[in-house]
A protein has these predicted regions:
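Catalytic alpha/beta core domains of metabolic enzymes, predominantly
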Residues: 108, 115-264
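Conserved, mostly hydrophobic/aromatic
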Residues: 34, 75, 85, 160, ...
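Active-site mouth loops of central-metabolism enzymes
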Residues: 3-29, 94-100, 127-135, 200-208
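Alpha-helix-loop-beta-strand connector modules within alpha/beta enzyme cores
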Residues: 6, 52-90, 175-195
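Glycine-rich, proline-tolerant flexible connector loops at the mouths of alpha/beta enzymes
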Residues: 35-70, 162-174
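Structural preference for beta-strand elements that scaffold enzyme active sites
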Residues: 1-3, 40-43, 69-73, 92-95, ...
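Catalytic beta/alpha-barrel core
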Residues: 43-49, 70-78, 93-103, 124, ...
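Short, acidic/polar
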Residues: 22-34, 104-105, 143, 210-215
Length: 269
């Protein structure tokens, strides 16, 4: 499972405060903690006004790279910001994100065409918003993949995000997401499928239980990437266990290795 660590995001109040104060040590500690917990990428999202975003992301990326060798997921809703901010990374990472909205793809996919090491998250939304049914999301998916082919971007560099919605307000959200995930996986075996796991549990008590259950269901359907908190030991344990149960971990070697490294299970003194 590809783990995109979510803990350096300006929408989190403590992170927003650190950004405002330019508290580099706070950002660095979060980067180190996520790397030690088993993250694959470290997401970096400023969540500041767009006119401040490029400079803020530059500072955040410098903080992260000063203490971590992990690639960075450069995160912004603005394609113009992403087109500038990715250049601050000293090694290829992940652009988060594009969608079928406006001309975002035509601003970002040329960057990927020229920079072969970079990957991208593609959201299944368009100018109408988030489609309600699986068929409409898959139509957005087909358009994104047609553009990827046009720009020479292989499926293995794309992380499709089917857009997880709140369980308590979405009548058929789970069925829609599982259908989209399984269909995308069937059509493109080498593509990555990701999700912001915690979106599923907003406004529900004991959110962790919902998050864990959804992760198992989604992985069974074909999810192989997730935006989540890697320092959540229960979540990491469930991910390693599910990979083993799905036959993705020969002889449970990854599960055993992760346990020995202390990534899940009782905290070892």
């Amino acid at each position: 499972m590809i783990i995109i660590g979510e803990k350096i995001n300006g929408s989190i109040p403590a992170v927003a405060e650190a950004i405002a104060k330019r508290d580099a040590e706070f950002i660095k500690k979060r980067a180190i903690a996520q790397e030690e917990a088993g993250a694959t990428f470290i997401d970096c999202c400023a969540s500041v006004p767009e006119e401040q975003e490029v400079e803020t992301l530059k500072w955040m990326i410098e903080c992260i790279e000063s203490v971590s060798d992990l690639p960075i997921a450069v995160d912004s809703p603005s394609a113009d910001v992403l087109a500038q901010a990715y250049k601050f990374c000293s090694r290829p990472g992940l652009i988060n994100s594009v969608s079928g909205e406006g001309d975002k793809i035509d601003k970002i996919f040329p960057i990927l065409a020229e920079n072969k090491g970079w990957q991208v998250i593609a959201l299944l939304s368009d100018d109408t918003g988030i489609p309600k049914c699986a068929a409409d999301r898959l139509r957005v998916f087909d358009k994104i993949m047609a553009k990827a082919k046009e720009y020479g971007i292989s499926p293995s560099r794309i992380h499709i995000d089917p857009l997880v919605e709140m369980l308590c307000t979405s009548e058929n959200g789970i069925e829609t997401n599982i259908e989209v995930i399984s269909t995308v996986r069937e059509r493109y075996p080498s593509i990555h499928i990701t999700a912001a796991v915690s979106n599923i549990s907003f406004n529900l008590p004991v959110r962790k239980m919902i998050n864990l259950g959804f992760t198992v269901l989604a992985m069974n359907a074909g999810l192989d990437s997730a935006i989540l908190d890697p320092t959540n030991r229960d979540m990491m344990g469930v991910i390693f266990a599910t990979e083993a149960l799905l036959g993705l971990d020969d002889y449970c070697m990854e599960y055993i290795g992760a346990y020995r490294e202390g990534l899940f299970g009782p905290v070892k003194n």
